[in-house]
């Protein structure tokens, strides 16, 4: 027996390894794996079901079918272990060896491996420098290829068809060698001298000029170097020996009725063996060449189908017309080996059931049905029963459990005590989709779930199911309790706000109990303390909403942690006083002295967590829930039809609108307005009417008249049930109430256009058939959208997780002082996100000074918490440089300082936190809430009148940012730069609003001037683009000849004449080359120069420009000499929602992207080519001018002679992130992408912390492109990992050599995932074949640094608690100790890690 145990123990030995290398297998290697050659295509005998000898299931080769029993039955039992039977040749061993023993097939003719041939770029093609077409013609026996030309005129690698071959034979005889088929390819590959070729290529590359050629050569060079470095030989890409998979991995199972269920691989192997044997026979018989050739081609095709069916030609199908599943299909795709078995395993000790509400549970509990618990905890129960002596053997214990004896239930209760279980609800979109609870045994068959965790699970009780998992080992239980317990997950990892927040009934109850009513019973009474209020309320002497005075004792926790007790009398209501009883000590009374709406409750829990800590908050949340449920029951709030009060004004508003529509219709009938104008006007009218109705309705609903104590009639907030539900945030919104009690309003057709006739009825009045029919469009589209959205959102999450999976916090501080400049996010004059919110939980990168002084008020390295935020706001700082994941210099992973606060815990992030995955989940999880639509700007939205002035909302001081301006004679300023901004700061100097100022805007205030709210500080004409002079003088016209380059127009109304410049295509031949311009000269006629330059002041006029001055006129500074009419931009669809987020993360270049200036300098326009304008920028530093061709239809914002800075917008359009990175750098790119993505989420009301987006962005910026190789081994134009390049440059700098220079590259998330260092991670993501082919050829090593790779090889992940295990192993590896780490050592390392992380 002992022997057996030792044997089993040895079987379980795991090889310890630190990297996995993938490469090409040489024929010798394949033979060394093999336990014999498969010679026959037979599988098993259909009568005896015994494997045939030398066949695909041969027991001699692969091992016995039954444990320790040879095939003929001569040797049985364990004692003969290792004996080889002399009769049948089978070794006596475990049948399990049939899963690991391989065989081989000796191929009669070499066969090219289809992956290296067809997987683009073709590796065989690159090495041989032949096209794929040519190689295929050789392989499939259509042409000869010259292998050795000898002394003839032929060239090596030249293709010959049959005729040419026979001609060559006649001419040269046997002086040359030309063959066909895979052996020819193998010969050519064998003949390649890698070292010589590499040397030749390295010399050739610097001498080539054409870009494409350099690309091709460097591709070849890279491949050759990869082969040389990996020890792979090129000829191994052609197989001479084919390995055979162990038979238990391609099973053949007899079904009843004499049929067999078989793996497709057996069919594919059978074809290969049949053709191979036939070919051997033909070669022995020395058959005619043409027959042999055909057989060889068929063998090649059979092997192709086995390796990757359907890659070349039509897929081979089985009897049922279904393509056979080849080896490649086994590993790729969702059902392949990687995603189905290695990354997604099924879990034992688990069960699932429907969930129902457990309103009496505490937050850390869940109700578990007894039946389930009994099954899940079986082994524990067996153990306990034996330990107690209630059962003697496991078998007896099993019987007891099956009979469900009473003592079993006692034991179960004991086993379950303090043994947490994990609850999971699919889809698990973020880490809060699996949490740990302590089970409470319940009768019934449904799992009970605590209502407050529903938000995290996104669960509801309409039939949702959840799975239960039991953590078995002590470590697992410890982690479940310490890290995954629901009480430890109060804050959301996405934004750091509480996620355990009451909703619906609870909110309604709390809101109801904290509302005040006028003249309620007991109003105006004064109470000594809360207990008295409680007694009086219970006795029915005071109503819940009565306004009272009460004396309270509150304890308030101060900033420094000291506790202040004070007693005061407050004006409040009975309900609020009752609610204060459950508020933990440390929070002031003011937190409950308001109507508790959803937002207020969320804020309250957040404050509670920050002030009094986790434990108190959990107890408080539970109490809040119980209170809320109790009072929502007492309130009896429910909806009746009479609650939907329809406003009296509705009929009048709709009547007026109908009349106006009739008026427009008659205008249309008489031809005064066009169809489009009519449509737009009507839709505008109805949306206005709709708004009026809903305003009237809300005014009606939200107030009610009551009599106060003096008998006067006063208004108070309404107690209408529906209004209370919406107002409290429990359910419903103004928009929904509008449909119930106002009017449904305008409906859209499925294509997104709005139907002109709105639904004037509401749901209380009921819809007519037509109205109902119109409204079905929208409902149906909604359902279709939702289905698509879920899939798209899931795929986005998967790509995000894949790109960021290996990003883990690996050190405390990387020591960089780089960072992002944070400013308040201001849009159209509103502060969308104040600075405080943006820097909360971040580390300051550089000292912050008090404005206007040199005093450091926030030192670098400070982690900004809520108190610092208040401090920063008080000192009115408007920009701070903070550390960011994008700038972190940690090599593998990221440092805690650059990441900042762990949002779900509220302190600095611990080492080992998997911040990449958290970021991906935080961005992906709300994906289902985003819309799928692309918004058409049409109807009401498109005609928000173009902005033509800046009107200040709040008063304050004017600040002008990077604005070039000139002062006009009347004292006003005129903007002459395009990127200028005007900001308004309050009395503390904090920016409150910010506006863009276009070129030519007239500004009526100066820097530092005080303005009142509502003042208009700047004006411009939105429909024309002015050309403004920057100096005074006399105008002279150059090249402006009437009817050749210009034409005069007289305005009929005003009688003024304008000069219009003709478009080039409208000019007569004489004017084609002339470029009209306006030149400025002084009184004596000498040229004037632009201020500060030696460029003459000459303004070239583009087509259609209108000139408003006469030749020889005197003009002053800042006057407008010409205007260019701007057609209002054609309506662009804005991509919104999920597709927009995906576009940004995939770094897709937008269509018609904006054009940015490549260099700083002066603009000029060169000669026009067909349909394009030539833009020339002459740099200020005197280097070569930069030229670019721009299509004519692009509208440019710049003029001849104007100065631009690098990265300034020349032509409007959506921004291209690649351009921003190239011209403006990483910080500008980060700012752009973060703001764009946040805009999409903000529109849906979803909050995500910026750092998650930055974390993903860091992964997209991993690669760099080498621009100068210096003394490094890199090739110019190569894409390399940034870390690799930095390591190499450090080495070169240490040896005083030239370092390589590089530019950052932005990759989309899919591309970034596929180009990761780990091939296991990339292969399990997408394009498995391509990734593995590339990895094998280059002999890649995977150092298993990421999470995915470690999951695949079945190890603890190097994150969280697994990091301790990995760092311990690394320590041992460095110290050359044995690598097996025992549990106790891991525990020691863990304790140390936990102690060092400071909490």
Curated annotation (Swiss-Prot):
Its cofactor is Mg(2+); Zn(2+). Binds 1 Mg(2+) ion per subunit. It holds the Pfam family RNA_pol_Rpb1_3. The keyword Magnesium applies. Zn(2+) 1 binds at residues 70, 72, 85, 88. It is an enzyme of class 2 (transferase). InterPro entries: DNA-dir_RpoC_beta_prime, DNA-dir_RpoC_beta_prime_bact, RNA_pol_asu, RNA_pol_N, RNA_pol_Rpb1_1, RNA_pol_Rpb1_3, RNA_pol_Rpb1_3_sf, RNA_pol_Rpb1_4. One of its GO terms (molecular function) is zinc ion binding. The keyword Transferase applies. Gene3D superfamilies: 1.10.132.30, 1.10.150.390, 1.10.1790.20, 1.10.40.90, 2.40.40.20, 2.40.50.100, RNA polymerase II, clamp domain, RNA polymerase Rpb1, domain 3. Its EC number is 2.7.7.6. GO terms for biological process: DNA-templated transcription. Keywords: DNA-directed RNA polymerase, Magnesium, Metal-binding, Nucleotidyltransferase, Transcription, Transferase, Zinc. Zn(2+) 2 binds at residues 814, 888, 895, 898. It catalyses: RNA(n) + a ribonucleoside 5'-triphosphate = RNA(n+1) + diphosphate. DNA-dependent RNA polymerase catalyzes the transcription of DNA into RNA using the four ribonucleoside triphosphates as substrates. Belongs to the RNA polymerase beta' chain family. The RNAP catalytic core consists of 2 alpha, 1 beta, 1 beta' and 1 omega subunit. When a sigma factor is associated with the core the holoenzyme is formed, which can initiate transcription. This is DNA-directed RNA polymerase subunit beta'. It comes from Pseudomonas putida (strain ATCC 700007 / DSM 6899 / JCM 31910 / BCRC 17059 / LMG 24140 / F1).
């Amino acid at each position: 027996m002992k022997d057996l145990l030792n044997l089993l123990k040895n079987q379980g030995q795991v090889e310890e390894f630190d990297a996995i290398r993938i490469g090409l297998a040489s024929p010798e290697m394949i033979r060394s794996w093999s336990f014999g050659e498969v010679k026959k295509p037979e599988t098993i005998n259909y009568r005896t079901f015994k494997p045939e000898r030398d066949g695909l299931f041969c027991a001699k080769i692969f091992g016995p079918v039954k444990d320790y029993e040879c095939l003929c039955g001569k040797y049985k039992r364990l004692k003969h272990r290792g004996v080889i039977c002399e009769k049948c040749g089978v070794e006596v061993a475990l049948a399990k060896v049939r899963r690991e023993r391989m065989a081989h097939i000796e191929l009669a003719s070499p066969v090219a491996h289809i992956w290296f041939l067809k997987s683009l770029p073709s590796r065989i093609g690159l090495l041989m420098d032949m096209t794929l077409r040519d190689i295929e013609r050789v392989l499939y026996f259509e042409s000869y290829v010259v292998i050795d030309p000898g002394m003839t005129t032929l060239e090596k690698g030249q293709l010959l068809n049959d005729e040419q071959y026979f001609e060559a034979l006649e001419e040269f005889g046997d002086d040359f060698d030309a063959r066909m088929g895979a052996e020819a390819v193998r010969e050519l590959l064998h003949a390649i001298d890698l070292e010589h070729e590499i040397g030749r290529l390295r010399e050739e590359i610097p001498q080539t000029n054409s870009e494409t050629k350099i690309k091709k050569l460097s591709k070849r060079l890279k491949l050759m170097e990869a082969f040389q470095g990996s020890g792979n030989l090129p000829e191994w890409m052609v197989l001479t020996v084919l390995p055979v998979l162990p038979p238990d991995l391609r099973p053949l199972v007899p079904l009843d009725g004499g049929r067999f269920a078989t793996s497709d691989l057996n069919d594919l192997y059978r074809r290969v063996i049949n053709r191979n044997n036939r070919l051997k026979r033909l070669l022995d018989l020395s058959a005619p060449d043409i027959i042999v050739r055909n057989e060889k081609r068929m063998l090649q095709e059979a092997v192709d189908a086995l390796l990757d069916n359907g890659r070349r030609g039509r897929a081979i199908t089985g009897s049922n017309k279904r393509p056979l599943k080849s080896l490649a299909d086994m590993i790729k795709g969702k059902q392949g080996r990687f995603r189905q078995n290695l990354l997604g395993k099924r879990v034992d000790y688990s069960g699932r059931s429907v969930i129902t509400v457990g309103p009496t549970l505490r937050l850390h509990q869940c109700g578990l049905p007894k039946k389930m618990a009994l099954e899940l905890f079986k082994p524990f129960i067996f153990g306990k029963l034996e330990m107690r002596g209630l059962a003697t053997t496991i078998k007896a214990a099993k019987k007891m459990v099956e009979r469900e004896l009473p003592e079993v239930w006692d034991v179960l209760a004991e086993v379950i005590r303090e043994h947490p279980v994990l609850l999971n609800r699919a889809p698990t979109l973020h880490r809060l989709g699996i949490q740990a609870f302590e089970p409470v045994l319940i009768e019934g068959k449904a799992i009970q779930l605590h209502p407050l965790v529903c938000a995290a699970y996104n669960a509801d009780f309409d039939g949702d199911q959840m799975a239960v998992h039991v953590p078995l080992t002590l470590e697992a239980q410890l982690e479940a309790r310490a890290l995954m317990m629901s009480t430890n997950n109060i804050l959301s990892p996405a934004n750091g706000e509480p996620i355990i927040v009451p909703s619906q009934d609870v909110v309604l109850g709390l809101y109801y109990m904290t509302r005040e009513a006028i003249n309620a019973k007991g109003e105006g009474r004064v109470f000594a303390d809360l207990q008295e209020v409680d007694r009086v309320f219970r006795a029915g002497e005071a109503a819940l909403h009565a306004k009272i005075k009460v004396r309270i004792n509150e304890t308030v926790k101060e900033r420094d942690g000291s506790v202040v007790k004070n007693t005061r009398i407050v004006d409040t209501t009975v309900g609020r006083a009752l609610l204060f009883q459950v508020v933990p000590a440390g929070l002031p009374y003011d937190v409950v002295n308001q109507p508790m709406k959803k937002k207020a409750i969320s804020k309250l829990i957040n404050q509670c967590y920050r002030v009094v800590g986790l434990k108190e908050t959990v107890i408080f949340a539970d109490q809040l829930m119980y209170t809320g449920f109790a009072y929502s029951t007492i309130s009896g709030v429910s909806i009746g039809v009479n609650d939907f009060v329809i406003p009296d004004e509705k009929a009048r508003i709709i009547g007026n609108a109908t009349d106006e529509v009739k008026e427009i219709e008659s205008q249309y009938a008489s031809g005064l307005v066009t169809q489009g104008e009519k449509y737009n006007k009507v839709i505008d009218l109805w949306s206005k009417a709709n708004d009026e109705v809903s305003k009237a309705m809300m005014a009606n609903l939200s107030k009610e008249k009551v009599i106060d104590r003096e008998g006067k009639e006063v208004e108070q907030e309404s107690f209408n049930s529906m209004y209370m539900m919406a107002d409290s945030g429990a359910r419903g919104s103004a928009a929904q109430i509008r449909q119930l009690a106002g009017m449904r309003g305008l409906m859209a057709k499925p294509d997104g256009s709005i139907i002109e006739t709105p639904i004037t009825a509401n749901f209380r009045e009921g819809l007519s058939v037509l109205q109902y029919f119109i409204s079905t469009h929208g409902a149906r589209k909604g359902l279709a959208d939702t289905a698509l959205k879920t899939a798209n959102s899931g795929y986005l999450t998967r790509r995000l997780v894949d790109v960021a999976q290996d990003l883990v916090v690996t050190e405390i501080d990387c020591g960089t002082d780089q960072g992002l400049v944070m400013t308040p996010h201001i849009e159209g004059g509103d502060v969308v996100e104040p600075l405080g919110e943006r820097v909360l939980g971040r580390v300051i990168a550089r000292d912050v000074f008090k404005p206007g002084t040199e005093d450091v008020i926030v030192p670098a390295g400070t982690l900004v918490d809520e108190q610092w935020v208040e401090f920063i706001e008080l000192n009115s700082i408007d920009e701070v440089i903070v550390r960011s994941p994008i700038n972190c210099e940690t090599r593998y992973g990221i440092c805690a300082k650059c990441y900042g606060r762990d949002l779900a815990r509220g302190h600095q992030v611990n080492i080992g936190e998997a911040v990449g995955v958290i970021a991906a989940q935080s961005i992906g999880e709300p994906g289902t809430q985003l819309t799928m639509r692309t918004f058409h700007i049409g109807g009401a939205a498109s005609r928000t009148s173009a902005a033509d002035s800046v009107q200040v909302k709040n008063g304050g001081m004017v600040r002008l940012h990077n604005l070039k301006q000139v002062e006009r004679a009347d004292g006003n300023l005129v903007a002459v730069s395009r990127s200028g901004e005007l900001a308004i700061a309050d009395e503390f100097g904090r920016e409150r609003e910010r506006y863009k100022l276009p070129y030519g805007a007239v500004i009526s205030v100066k820097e530092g001037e005080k303005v009142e709210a509502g003042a208009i500080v700047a004006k411009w004409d939105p429909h024309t683009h002015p050309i403004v002079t920057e100096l005074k003088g006399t105008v002279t016209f150059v090249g402006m000849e009437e009817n050749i380059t210009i034409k005069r127009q007289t305005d009929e109304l005003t009688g003024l004449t304008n000069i219009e410049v003709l478009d080039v295509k409208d000019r007569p031949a004489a004017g084609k080359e002339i470029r009209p311009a306006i030149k400025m000269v002084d009184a004596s006629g000498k040229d004037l120069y632009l201020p500060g330059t030696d460029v003459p002041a000459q303004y070239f006029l583009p087509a259609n420009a209108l000139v408003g001055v006469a030749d020889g006129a005197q003009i002053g500074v800042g006057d407008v000499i010409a205007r260019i009419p701007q057609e209002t931009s054609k309506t662009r669809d804005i991509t919104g929602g999920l597709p927009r987020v995906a576009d940004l993360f995939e770094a897709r270049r937008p269509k018609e992207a904006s054009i940015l200036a490549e260099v700083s300098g002066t603009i000029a326009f060169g000669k026009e080519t067909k349909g394009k304008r030539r833009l020339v920028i002459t740099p200020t530093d005197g280097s070569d001018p930069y030229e670019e061709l721009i299509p004519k239809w692009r509208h440019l914002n710049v003029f001849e002679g104007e100065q631009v800075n690098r990265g300034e917008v020349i032509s409007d359009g959506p921004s291209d992130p690649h351009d921003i990175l190239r011209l403006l750098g990483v910080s500008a790119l980060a700012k752009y992408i973060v703001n764009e993505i946040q805009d999409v989420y903000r529109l849906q009301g979803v909050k995500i912390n910026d750092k998650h987006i930055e974390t993903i962005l860091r992964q997209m910026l991993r690669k760099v492109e080498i621009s100068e190789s210096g003394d490094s081994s890199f090739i110019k134009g190569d894409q390399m990992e940034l870390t690799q390049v930095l390591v190499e440059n450090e080495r070169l700098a240490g040896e005083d050599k030239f370092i390589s220079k590089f530019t950052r590259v932005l990759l989309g998330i899919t591309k970034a995932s596929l180009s990761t260092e780990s091939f296991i991670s990339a292969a399990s993501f997408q394009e498995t074949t391509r990734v593995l082919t590339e990895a094998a050829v280059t002999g890649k090593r995977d150092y298993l640094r990421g999470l995915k790779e470690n999951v695949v090889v079945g190890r603890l992940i190097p994150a969280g608690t697994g990091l301790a295990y990995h760092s311990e192993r690394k320590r041992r590896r460095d110290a050359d100790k044995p690598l097996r780490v025992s549990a106790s050592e891991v525990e020691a390392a863990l304790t140390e890690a936990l102690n060092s992380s400071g909490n």
